[in-house]
């Protein structure tokens, strides 16, 4: 069974396909992030999403996000946090498919997602964040659509402040790729590679303040209406934190696990 329109074969990387006009999809994301260089750190990100095909090559989505944080001894400047499933924010997105990998040499889509968040994803501290995420999505299918290769380039401009402080700006750049093979009807096995970096005080400055590289396996299973995707990501390189032997465990975690469950209707 080849990949279906807008099927989430990967947990972090997106394909270029959209839902058909009038089709809808509901799904939940659960991401578990653990292990930093100091103290105890585990955080869970939750996302509830409804997606709808507005046209055969254009879709829209609405999201609600929630967050749990259990942090102790992370930094002398930060207090301990014990938070369970708190409302974090809301996002909306639009995705426009310019070409399909099933009818063209390569599938191309563009994606825009504005939103806001109430908690800092790295520290768990209370904040106000506004952001606009943009993506270029590429997809190439091989071997009668059984082998799927995707690539994403993402830029997210953020504006945030904590308490009564001044607004600060940051640019996050990410590049990711995923490769998966349809080994049996409805079952894809593959892996993902993801590079992410932050540029503080952008656009006034363009200087990379931190980065990390993650890699790991992904498995996807789909039926006529239900599907599930599970991915494990291990940090394999990072900087500029020199205390963790070429890993950046001050700004990012050592490992992430993401589960996505979806229903088509």
Predicted regions and their residues:
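Transmembrane beta-barrel domains of Gram-negative outer membranes and organellar outer membranes
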Residues: 4-263
């Amino acid at each position: 069974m080849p990949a279906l329109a807008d099927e989430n074969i990967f947990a972090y990387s997106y394909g270029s396909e959209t839902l058909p006009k009038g089709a809808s999809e509901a799904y939940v994301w659960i991401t578990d992030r653990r292990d930093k260089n100091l103290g105890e750190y585990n955080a869970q990100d939750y996302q509830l999403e409804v997606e709808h095909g507005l046209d055969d090559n254009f879709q829209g989505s609405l999201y609600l996000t929630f967050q749990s944080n259990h942090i102790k001894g992370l930094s002398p400047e930060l207090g301990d946090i014990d938070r369970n499933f708190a409302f974090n924010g809301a996002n909306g997105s639009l995705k426009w498919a310019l070409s399909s990998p099933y009818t063209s040499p390569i599938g191309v889509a563009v994606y825009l997602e504005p939103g806001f968040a109430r908690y800092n994803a790295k520290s768990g501290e209370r904040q106000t964040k506004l952001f606009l995420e943009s993506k270029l999505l590429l997809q190439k299918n091989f071997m009668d659509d059984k082998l799927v290769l995707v690539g994403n380039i993402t830029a997210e401009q953020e504006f945030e402040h904590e308490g009564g402080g001044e607004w600060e700006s940051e640019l996050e750049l990410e590049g990711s790729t995923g490769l998966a093979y349809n080994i049996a009807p409805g079952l894809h096995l593959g892996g993902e590679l993801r590079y992410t970096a932050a540029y503080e005080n952008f656009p006034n400055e363009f200087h990379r303040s931190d980065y990390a590289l993650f890699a790991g396996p992904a498995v996807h299973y789909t039926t006529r209406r239900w599907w599930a995707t599970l991915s494990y990501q291990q940090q394999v390189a990072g900087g500029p934190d020199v205390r963790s032997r070429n890993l950046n465990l001050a700004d990012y975690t050592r490992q992430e696990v993401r589960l996505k469950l979806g229903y088509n209707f």
